[in-house]
Design a protein with these regions (language model features):
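Extended alpha-helical scaffold regions
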Residues: 1-309
């Protein structure tokens, strides 16, 4: 176990423990990794001076290693509990550093499939903690993710209730990046509710703000996808195809195979609906489509052949 030691010795002990963690990971000693990570995470610094940059880095590293291990092993409950447990343990961390740790773990957990109800509960837990600790920016980040989760669970009114307050607050704080993300979720919710005018208005707001800041490729692909869906709803399939193609290229460049395949399906749909079945068949038979052949593409092929005939 880690013992209490004066100042720099505390950070040195944590650093040595992290080295042991890395070695245990290489040797696939799961039990040892969990034990060592928990020791580093749970031990308290003797004084505020002991929690220096090296000590914080060691605790942060141990947290990430443990979280990734839980994710790889499918220990979702343990991953969720880890996020709850570190809140009081890391309360003396620099605010920006703690926010980074919470965001990183939360984003990792968001990738878990089939556990949306638990993720909603976790979101509410973290939001309540943020309110108590006056961490408004972190709260708004988690609220954006929560709204997206509620959208996926088809709890559209609950999502809109959060988004209406959130977008108003984000506009006042001029957090443009998060405003883009929240308004994109809003557009998806209205689209699911078949309220095309509001879905389009939210998307227009997204693009207006996005034009003034740098948008990461993954978010840009999501914006393009939403643009394609709305264009398709308006039966402008030529424009829809161009957006779906941009989405496809974006996901393909990021090696997001499943998402690229999803957008490829919509590319084919647009060509077929635009009465260009020959183009759809050419895409299906092209070298670029080999990675994305599945039952959905096969179904599109049958439709294209039927239309051609």
């Amino acid at each position: 176990m880690i013992t209490t030691a004066p100042r720099s010795e505390f950070a040195e002990q944590l650093t040595k423990k992290v080295e042991e963690i890395e070695m245990a990971l290489e040797n696939q000693q799961t039990g040892t990794v969990i034990k060592l990570c928990e020791e580093v995470i749970k031990v308290n610094a003797p004084t505020s001076e002991d929690l220096n940059e090296d000590a914080v880095k060691a605790k942060e590293t141990a947290t990430y290693r443990l979280a990734n291990l839980y994710k790889e092993k499918g220990l979702v409950d343990e991953l969720i509990n880890l996020q709850k447990n570190i809140l009081p343990l890391f309360v003396d961390f620099p605010k920006s550093k703690l926010a980074k740790v919470i965001r990183t773990l939360f984003d990792l957990t968001m990738k878990v499939e089939g556990r949306n109800a638990e993720l909603v509960s976790l979101s509410h837990y973290i939001i309540a903690w943020c309110d108590k600790e006056s961490r408004s920016f972190l709260r708004m980040r988690i609220e954006t993710n929560l709204a997206d989760l509620l959208y996926q669970l088809e709890k559209y009114q609950d999502a809109l209730e959060i988004l209406n307050k959130l977008t108003y607050e984000l506009k006042k704080k001029e957090d443009k990046q998060l405003l883009v993300e929240s308004q994109l979720v809003e557009s998806k919710v209205y689209h699911a509710l078949e309220n095309l005018p509001k879905a389009k208005a939210s998307l227009t707001a997204v693009k207006t703000v996005a034009n003034s800041i740098y948008i990461v490729p993954l978010l840009q692909a999501q914006i393009d996808m939403m643009s394609g869906l709305i264009a398709a709803d308006e039966r402008d399939f030529t424009t829809a195809y161009s957006y779906f193609y941009e989405t496809f290229e974006g996901y393909r460049s990021m090696n997001e195979h499943e998402l690229a395949g999803h957008s490829f399906k919509f590319m084919l749909f647009s060509k077929i609906m635009d009465r260009h079945s020959e183009d759809a068949l050419a895409l299906i038979n092209s070298a670029i489509s080999l990675k994305y052949q599945n039952r959905h593409v096969e179904a599109m092929k049958e439709v294209a052949l039927a239309n051609k005939a």
